[in-house]
């Protein structure tokens, strides 16, 4: 998570989204289902040009002390709450209780992932939930007029200074972008065995 925060200072970087994911049981209103849980940063919606249908997305909390808020994918909202407005309701993810603050617009399937059958929680809480030491990947968007090689070099410089060695991979997501269509100028990076970095 500290790596992601450091990348915010790289020139031309627009949004930074630290990411971890796994599967967990989600319970509410006496109903339960197993869904994909995405641990993300507060800029995830901007990074992937996704819109909130109801309520709001995760707030910019201190990453080390993020509140137990959750944003529901549209299918999870429908399955657990039907036509009832879920905002303010409590749901259980794993052994923790979260307060629903938003519902995402329907996105359907992207690259084989059903983005509607998911929930979004703060990345630090996802790391605890899945007992992980580090991020899976960090998504970075950069300004469209910035040269890609300069952005990559800036990210590499910051990570080398923090890690002392090149234990990460940086992957410009051009093929993914062609498929997704709606995401522009994003980079993803993967950090060592614990995770990765993507440039979107």
Locate predicted features.
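Short amphipathic beta-strand/extended segments in non-transmembrane regions
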Residues: 2-57, 170-171
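Solvent-exposed polar/charged
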Residues: 8-9, 46, 128, 161, ...
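Short linear capping/connector segments at secondary-structure termini
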Residues: 21-23, 61-63, 138-139, 173-176
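A short acidic, helix-capping loop that chelates divalent metal ions and anchors anionic groups
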Residues: 25-28, 108-112, 177-180
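Mid-to-C-terminal secondary-structure elements
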Residues: 38, 42-62, 66-165
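Peri-transmembrane interface segments
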Residues: 154-155, 164-197
């Amino acid at each position: 998570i500290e790596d992601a925060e450091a990348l915010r200072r790289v020139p031309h970087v627009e949004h930074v989204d630290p990411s971890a994911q796994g599967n967990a049981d989600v319970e509410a209103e006496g109903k339960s289902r197993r869904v994909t849980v995405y641990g993300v940063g507060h800029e995830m919606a901007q990074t992937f040009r996704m819109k909130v249908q109801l309520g709001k997305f995760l707030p910019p909390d201190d990453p080390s002390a993020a509140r137990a808020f959750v944003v529901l994918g549209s299918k999870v909202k429908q399955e657990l709450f039907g036509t009832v407005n879920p905002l303010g309701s409590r749901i259980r993810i794993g052994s923790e209780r979260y307060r629903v603050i938003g519902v995402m617009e329907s996105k359907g399937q992207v690259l084989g992932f059903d983005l509607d059958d998911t929930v979004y929680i703060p990345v630090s809480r996802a790391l605890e939930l899945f007992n992980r030491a580090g991020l899976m990947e960090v998504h970075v968007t950069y300004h469209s007029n910035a040269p890609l090689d300069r952005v990559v070099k800036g990210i590499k410089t910051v990570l080398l200074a923090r890690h002392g060695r090149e234990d990460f991979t940086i992957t410009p997501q051009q093929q993914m972008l062609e498929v997704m269509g709606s995401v522009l100028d994003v980079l993803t990076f993967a950090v060592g065995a614990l995770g990765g970095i993507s440039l979107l």
